[in-house]
Amino acid sequence: MCQFLAVALKDMKFLPVEKILKNGTVVTIRQAIKKDAEGLLQTVSRYMIDSDHLVTSIEEFNPTILDEKRWIEALNENRNSLLLIATHKKKIIGNINLNGETRKKTRHNAVLGIGILKEWRSIGLGEILMQCAIDWAKENLTLETLWLHVFATHFKAIGLYKKMGFEEVAVQQDFIKNDDNSYSDNLVMKLSVKTN
């Protein structure tokens, strides 16, 4: 079970929690703070290089440490947004974010993004990060629906998302143009976090 705060205390929405991965390694899941900006940038840059399933390329990813601090601060201040990081021995190994919509008519929605270093994949970290974010969203007073976008050919990720309760709602054909000039479909998935 992940621990979170229904009401933020000094921008903290989520209490740190230790989790055990399938290989027995203990990791800490906690809310990101501005001091994490440099480490988070390094981690994101590393997993962007190792993944063929991200829309943003490493050449396009060029925020400064100040930009990253502002992004972290914005997510922490927005009551329907969350940014969690996974750490091992104080090194960031993955992250998940819920980017909550800010407009009145759409703020019940958040878009989920997740990334994990290559050497930490396939040992349960993605499921743990997703469960913590989903549990937090279920208790959030504003959020009703989580959305995500995924390459339609990223079957491993799609399997995890379905396991976590997401359902396919749309396919954008040929939405992604790959480096080799081939096309990939974008799959839109949704999870309702409020039961009426």
Model-assigned labels for residue ranges:
Residues 48, 60-119, 130, 192-194:
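Acetyl-CoA-dependent GNAT
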Residues 116, 122-136, 159-163:
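Conserved acetyl-CoA-binding loop-helix of GNAT-fold acetyltransferases
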